[in-house]
């Protein structure tokens, strides 16, 4: 009897184990696909998702090619899943206008993953709701034409180092990767303009600032870990935030300490002793007791107009005595954001322009003539000179940003349930603006793969359908640093093309292969020859 009882217990234990295993497997199977019915219920077309990871493998070649494929397969309104998160992708200009402008109050925030470094989380890029509005309003004055004119000499100083290195490349006559030169140059610009220090990243790569910048840009999340985070976000995201991360803590500590030291130094200096850099503009804005309102936040329209230096439009100021001043962490966040955006986007834009000029010599010749005439009139260029006197350069830059927009996708998050041109959007949904797909839509841009600066003559701009050209976004949350970014690009090209011309060579990759992770960039560099003029 005892043997039978023991056997019965063992059988019962086995049954329980098997039953629990079956239940667990059933729950896992349900969990692996339970989030993947939302797009279908909304009537939005999308690729078939895989269990747990959604459409992660669809993007294995990068987001650039995949966005173009999404548009071709599913149209200007489609979607996908990354892990359990649903993305609604739009490249229809009328829907984009509704999201970015007409219904901005419901789409004022960017998507946050919860894994952003503290320096990014404290920047105007990722701040949310009222705090974003306060900080953005306070920072607007730092990007006025007058303030940018004060920063122009610092950028010109960094250009001198770049010209010196290009002179050696011209003398050698060898092909070289000019993207690497631009990378060093933009590091120098960011160090000077955003952090208030002087570095020479090409000749002194051991500089601590340069070393830490390289660590920032070398970081990437391993694909297996990314798949795990996307599959189990409610567990993995909080876990990743609390687990020790030596690299993250060291980078955050370095840049935060650097900013604090510079701020302490500026506090001891007189107004005349302080550098006219971006950091000082932010510090000045912090001390200001007024800011502009949301209705004046869109800087892109003005920045893309040559008439902006005729006087800024009146900005409605609101007292901000009840708003908390920028914290040191937030000031560090703005400088760090300048590092990320200024380095990646400026480097890639300069690289793409160089490639296009080298492979389109007739366009380069026309631009060289304009540059020479401009430099005769303005040997020491200022911000407003650059806005008014280089129309063909503006056209070349604009067409490059159409073909190769470095920031080729960005997100908005729906605060409440709403409808956008008849499409229901649930609260919490992430909308992704597919700038790359929009810029390569033949309906709006005939022969989109052809480099044609004539698309951006003054007359042609008037014929463009609104919200079909978005290299800097649009609306109140468009790129805050658009003026400064264009200033760096245009001043650099002006200085370089006044001394050199670009030539394609056997090492030049045609067509250019692209890589798209956080930003669009040349995959294998840009190899050209450079010739002294």
From Swiss-Prot:
Gene3D superfamilies: Cytochrome P450
Catalytic function, reaction form: prostaglandin H2 = thromboxane A2; prostaglandin H2 = (12S)-hydroxy-(5Z,8E,10E)-heptadecatrienoate + malonaldehyde; a hydroperoxyeicosatetraenoate = an oxoeicosatetraenoate + H2O; (15S)-hydroperoxy-(5Z,8Z,11Z,13E)-eicosatetraenoate = 15-oxo-(5Z,8Z,11Z,13E)-eicosatetraenoate + H2O
Domain of life, per lineage: Eukaryota
BP GO annotations: icosanoid metabolic process; intracellular chloride ion homeostasis; positive regulation of vasoconstriction; prostaglandin biosynthetic process; response to ethanol; response to fatty acid
Cytoplasmic side: 1-10, 97-223, 357-533
UniProt KW keywords: Endoplasmic reticulum, Fatty acid biosynthesis, Fatty acid metabolism, Heme, Iron, Isomerase, Lipid biosynthesis, Lipid metabolism, Lyase, Membrane, Metal-binding, Monooxygenase, Oxidoreductase, Prostaglandin biosynthesis, Prostaglandin metabolism, Transmembrane, Transmembrane helix
Topology class, membrane: Multi-pass membrane protein
One term under GO cellular component: endoplasmic reticulum membrane
Function as written in the Swiss-Prot or TrEMBL entry: Catalyzes the conversion of prostaglandin H2 (PGH2) to thromboxane A2 (TXA2), a potent inducer of blood vessel constriction and platelet aggregation. Also cleaves PGH2 to 12-hydroxy-heptadecatrienoicacid (12-HHT) and malondialdehyde, which is known to act as a mediator of DNA damage. 12-HHT and malondialdehyde are formed stoichiometrically in the same amounts as TXA2. Additionally, displays dehydratase activity, toward (15S)-hydroperoxy-(5Z,8Z,11Z,13E)-eicosatetraenoate (15(S)-HPETE) producing 15-KETE and 15-HETE.
Entry protein name: Thromboxane-A synthase
Encoding gene, per UniProt annotation: Tbxas1
């Amino acid at each position: 009897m005892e043997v039978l009882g023991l056997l019965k217990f063992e059988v019962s234990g086995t049954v329980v184990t098997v039953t629990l295993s079956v239940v667990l497997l059933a729950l896992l199977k349900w969990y692996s696909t339970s989030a993947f019915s939302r797009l279908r219920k909304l009537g939005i077309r999308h690729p078939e998702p895989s269990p747990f990871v959604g459409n992660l493998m669809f993007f294995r070649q990068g987001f650039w090619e995949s966005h173009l494929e999404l548009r071709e397969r599913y149209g200007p309104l489609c979607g996908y899943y990354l892990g359990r998160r649903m993305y609604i992708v739009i490249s229809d200009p009328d829907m984009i206008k509704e999201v970015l402008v007409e219904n901005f109050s419901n789409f004022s925030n960017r998507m946050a993953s919860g894994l952003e470094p503290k320096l990014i989380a404290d920047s105007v890029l990722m701040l949310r709701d009222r705090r974003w509005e306060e900080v953005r309003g306070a920072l607007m004055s730092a990007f006025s034409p007058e303030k940018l004119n004060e920063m122009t000499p610092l950028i010109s100083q960094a250009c001198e180092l770049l010209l010196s290195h290009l002179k050696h490349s011209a003398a050698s006559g060898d092909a070289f990767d000019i993207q690497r030169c631009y990378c060093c140059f933009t590091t120098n610009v960011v160090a000077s303009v955003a952090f208030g220090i002087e570095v020479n990243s090409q000749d002194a790569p051991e500089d601590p600032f340069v070393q830490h910048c390289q660590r920032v840009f070398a970081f990437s999340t391993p694909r297996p870990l990314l798949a795990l985070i996307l599959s189990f976000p409610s567990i993995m995201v909080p876990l990743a935030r609390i687990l020790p991360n030596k690299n993250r803590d060291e980078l955050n500590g370095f840049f935060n300490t650097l900013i604090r030291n510079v701020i302490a130094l500026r506090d001891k200096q007189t107004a005349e002793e302080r550098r006219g850099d971006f950091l000082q503009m932010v510090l000045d804005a912090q001390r200001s007791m007024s800011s502009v309102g949301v209705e004046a936040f869109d800087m892109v329209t003005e920045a893309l107009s040559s008439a902006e230096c005729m006087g800024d439009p009146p900005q409605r100021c609101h007292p901000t005595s009840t708003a908390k001043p920028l914290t040191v962490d937030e000031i560090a966040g703005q400088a760090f954001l300048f590092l990320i955006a200024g380095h990646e986007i400026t480097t890639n834009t300069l690289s793409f322009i160089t490639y296009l000029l080298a492979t389109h010599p007739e366009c380069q010749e026309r631009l060289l003539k304009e540059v020479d005439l401009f430099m005769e009139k303005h040997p020491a260029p200022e911000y407003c000179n650059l806005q008014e006197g280089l129309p063909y350069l503006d056209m070349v830059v604009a067409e490059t940003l159409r073909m190769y927009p470095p920031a080729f996708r960005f997100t908005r998050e729906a605060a409440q349930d709403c409808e956008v041109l008849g499409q229901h959007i649930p609260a919490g949904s992430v909308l992704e603006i597919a700038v790359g797909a929009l810029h390569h839509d033949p309906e709006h841009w005939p022969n989109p793969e052809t480099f044609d600066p004539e698309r951006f003559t003054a007359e042609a701009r008037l014929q463009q359908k609104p919200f079909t050209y978005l290299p800097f976004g649009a609306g109140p949350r468009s790129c805050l640093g658009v003026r400064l970014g264009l200033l760096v690009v245009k001043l650099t090209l002006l200085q370089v093309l006044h001394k050199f011309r670009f030539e394609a060579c056997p090492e030049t990759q045609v067509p250019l292969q692209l890589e798209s992770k956080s930003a669009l960039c040349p995959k294998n560099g840009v190899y050209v020859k450079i010739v002294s003029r």
